Amino acid sequence: PALLHPMGMGDVPDYDMGRENSLEQLAARQGKDPVEVYVDRLIESEGRELWNFWAFGGALENQWAYMKMDHCVPMLADAGAHVGIFTDTDSPTFLLAELTRRQGVYTLPEAVHRITLKSADVLGLKERGAVKEGWIADLNIIDYENLETGYPYYVNDFPHNGGRYIVESAGYLGTMVAGNMIVENGKHTGSRPGTVIREFARN
């Protein structure tokens, strides 16, 4: 119960960054058994509310210190490997909204650098990660003050009715790939000019 944190029932997930609303803390304040609180919240949300498991203990000050280290690259993930259990595809949005705007872990330019050029360098992606003449760049136009990750939800759109979690974001005014707008005001335009990257460092 000490590591389980409800993500709320609104449009934006509550990650309880202040560490004040674990299942254990909620149960203690309400004078109830943690299981009772858990079931009550599931009933209230009609099963929609998700819970965040703080597997690494929640010592956020230590994590912020690690993330400021020069060799830390925060955005390399396996977003597609566990989509039936959780999704971390919103990690770049969370980093820009939470770690720059609210927590001050990074400045905005530093955050952008770490999730673009620094990530490209680690993966060995050539001529990517920066806006330079002759380089390949995908460009996001963002409304920084309103940039926010959405609440994850489950859909069954895989072959044979397979399911996955997806999460949407707010604050993206447009995304341009290969000179084409593929997203405008959060909606896909139908354009798919991108290609699969096959050349990268393998050792």
Over which residues does each language-model region extend?
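Short loop/turn motifs at secondary-structure junctions and domain boundaries
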Residues: 16-17, 120, 164-167
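C-terminal cap of metal-dependent C-N hydrolases
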Residues: 65-72, 77, 91, 141-187, ...
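Short, surface-exposed, low-complexity cationic segments
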Residues: 190-203
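Active-site neighborhoods of metal-dependent hydrolases
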Residues: 1-104
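Hydrophobic, well-ordered secondary-structure elements that form the walls
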Residues: 31, 78, 96, 111, ...
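Acidic, glycine-enriched loop/beta-strand segments at the rims
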Residues: 49-63, 107-112, 120-154
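Acidic/polar loop patches that form or flank catalytic/metal-binding clefts of enzymes
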Residues: 34-37, 107-109, 183-184
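Flexible loop/turn segments at secondary-structure boundaries
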Residues: 44-48, 81-84, 119-122, 147-150, ...
